[in-house]
Regions:
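Bacterial Sec-dependent N-terminal signal peptides
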Residues: 1-24
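Short, ordered coil/turn segments that flank beta-strands lining enzyme active or ligand-binding pockets
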Residues: 17, 96, 125, 154, ...
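Sec-dependent signal peptide cleavage junction
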Residues: 17-71
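N-terminal trafficking/processing presequences and adjacent post-cleavage segments
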Residues: 21-36, 87-108
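Exposed beta-strand-loop-beta-strand "reactive/processing" segments of non-cytosolic proteins
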Residues: 51-92, 141-161
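A short, surface-exposed beta-strand/turn
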Residues: 91-102, 159-173
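Long, charged/polar, surface-exposed segments that mediate recognition or autoinhibition
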Residues: 93-132
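Short, solvent-exposed loop/turn elements at beta->coil junctions and helix N-caps
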Residues: 133-139
Length: 173
């Protein structure tokens, strides 16, 4: 009987010790924050990264978030930062105080969200997506444009569609 109680106590202590192990969960580098706010003199710059499924989009936005404008903007009414990579570009405009005014992003041949793919194939059965572009524009922390421009083809017919990330077809029907 003493042996049974000893074994139960030993197992109980072992389980409680493992339950108290603290694991540090770090932010993975491929996860961007929902909102990036930077101090620009007396103003604040706001940038909203997109949670796009394409790795190239997230990498470009990560580079932009990590970019430090420093004092380069001094002496200019507007200062433009251009980041380019293979089939992608990001253009950011800063004012004379270093505040982020506008960001325009364009990506070609990106991985499309499931909602966009399902919506297009449901609305256009038998058609194939042959080309796509992702456009993302924001000004002063407000998203102005977030859309996919698609080219679809069936036999010799070609159509151009504009699709919202939630799958809503905006134009081209």
């Amino acid at each position: 009987m003493k042996i049974v109680f000893s074994i139960v106590a030993l197992v109980g202590f072992t389980l409680t010790l493992n339950a108290q192990t603290i694991q540090d969960e770090e932010l993975r580098p491929d996860e961007l924050p929902a909102v990036v706010i930077k101090n620009a003199g007396k103003d604040f710059s706001v940038y909203l990264p997109d949670r796009n499924p394409d790795v190239r989009v997230r990498q470009m936005q990560d580079k932009f978030v990590g970019y430090n404008i420093g004092k380069d903007f001094e002496g200019h009414d507007e200062y433009i930062v251009l980041l380019e990579a293979d089939e992608s570009s990001l253009v950011a405009t800063y004012n004379d105080t270093g505040k982020l005014i506008r960001v325009v992003e364009k990506y070609d041949n990106v991985k499309l969200p499931r909602s966009v793919i399902f919506s297009v194939y449901k609305s256009f059965p038998g058609w194939v997506i042959v080309k796509d572009k992702f456009l993302y524009t924001q000004a002063d922390g407000d998203i102005l444009k977030k859309q996919y421009n698609l080219k679809i083809k069936k036999d010799n017919d070609v159509k151009r569609l504009v699709v919202h990330p939630n799958g809503e077809i905006i134009a081209g029907i």
